[in-house]
Amino acid sequence: MAKERCQKRSFQDTLEDIKNRMKEKRNKNLAGIGKRKSFIVAPGQVPTNTATLLRYYQDNNRLLVLALENEKSKVREAQDVILQLRKECYYLTCQLYALKEKLTSRQSEETTQNWKGRPSDVVSSIDNTTRDLSGKSLQQIAVEETDCPYQTTEPSPAVTPETQGCDFDSGKVESTDEVLPRTISIRRHLRKDFSNISHSTTLEDCKASPRVAQSLEVKGSRCREVTVTLHRLENVCLWNKDQISLCSRLINPAKITETEVILSSKPEQIESKHKRARKRRAEQRRTKQRCKSKSSLRSKGNKNKDKQGLPPTTLDGGIGSCDAYDFNLKGTVHPTPFRQKMNNGCNKETDSSNSEVSDLECSTSEDESDDLYLPPSKRLRDYRESERAVTRPRSKRGLQYPDGKERKEVLPSTAPTGIPPETQESPRCSLKDVTNILQCPRVKIRKPSLPPKRREDSPAVALTKRRCSTIKSYKEPTLASKLRRGDPFTDLCFLNSPIFKQKRGMRCPKRRTKQTQ
């Protein structure tokens, strides 16, 4: 027994046992899944016969079909209800639209009837009220003018039943006899023309008699009533103005003619005022433009004076570091700081004083003028052709000299115009004069390399100028170049590229075949 215990099982045997156990478990699980249980059967009752199982299945199917039919019937009923409700909603909306149309048609009919029936009555009532008010106001003015100046008490103005219904401060008409219809639009703003009609007579009377000034408020209120009634019913009875003017002429023709004259002259006066204002504005603009043009002309004159008075040295001095941001330089050449012109000490002093004066004048002219800002170097640049800056001469590369040296120092053939004769004639200077005197620019020219025979024979031959190596031609290309341009089989540049380099093994048989042929 001890020996058997001591004997250990191999690893493979243990693995086989584990595999067998796993297979058994899997088979059990598959057998349990394969068994089909009925839905209605209780867990305690397990059917054994196939006949009983078939019965159970049939009963379940019948129940499912009945439930399905019930659900379908319910859905149909719900759909019928939805359709009926939609029909009712559509019918109600149609009724609503029809009622709205009827309402709008009735309102339009009522408005047309009101417009047709009412205006005659309204116009007649307005005529009566305006006649009474205008007659009473004019009569009271005449009576007050004839009264004695020593009289302290004034007769109280008679209040008519028409005026009781009007509220002047609020601007609303509350007449007791007749009310305006709803459709008539009422404007609360008064026109200036009607206010002029009412107030013109009162102003004339005030100038004549001082007593009228006290009772002017009462008259103004009455006249306002007339203007309010006229203005508010302007849309209804525009044709009634002639009748009102005729009635007022019958009462007091002299004063009404005066008011009419004043009214007719009013718009002309307004137009004349507008014209005067326009003329004044135009004159002010012209004067401003003249002042600006004068200031600009003065500044230009100062500039020209500065240019004429300054010598070429100051002109060259003006062209300085400011030219870095000046892009208007076209033909001028920037002189180097080592190539300035030489002048005597007295000339320099006078030039410096002149330049200071010119700078001050330019600054004052800039303050006065409204022109665009320009850099200071721009103003000193517009000088004559004779007074240009010193340009750098070209190096004469093409010239050949008989000496055998590779390099030479050659003086320029054309000396600059502005340099005095001393600097041209004295190339050799002492150490003291080097800093003050401008030496002539010396150009180092390299001798072109030529064969020795030609160097000995030809003394000086002008070679062709050096040009740009790349030349762009805009001519129409030839047919061959057109064909080769984009075609990978005929394009030479494309075929010469390393992509199309064939291998050595591919080239050898081709050569051999050519040799054999």
Curated annotation (Swiss-Prot):
GO terms for molecular function: kinase binding. Residues 273-302 have a biased composition (Basic residues). Residues 341-363 have a biased composition (Polar residues). Gene3D superfamilies: Single helix bin. Its main location: nucleus. Plays a central role in chromosome cohesion during mitosis by preventing premature dissociation of cohesin complex from centromeres after prophase, when most of cohesin complex dissociates from chromosomes arms. May act by preventing phosphorylation of the STAG2 subunit of cohesin complex at the centromere, ensuring cohesin persistence at centromere until cohesin cleavage by ESPL1/separase at anaphase. Essential for proper chromosome segregation during mitosis and this function requires interaction with PPP2R1A. Belongs to the shugoshin family. This is Shugoshin 1. It comes from Mus musculus (Mouse).
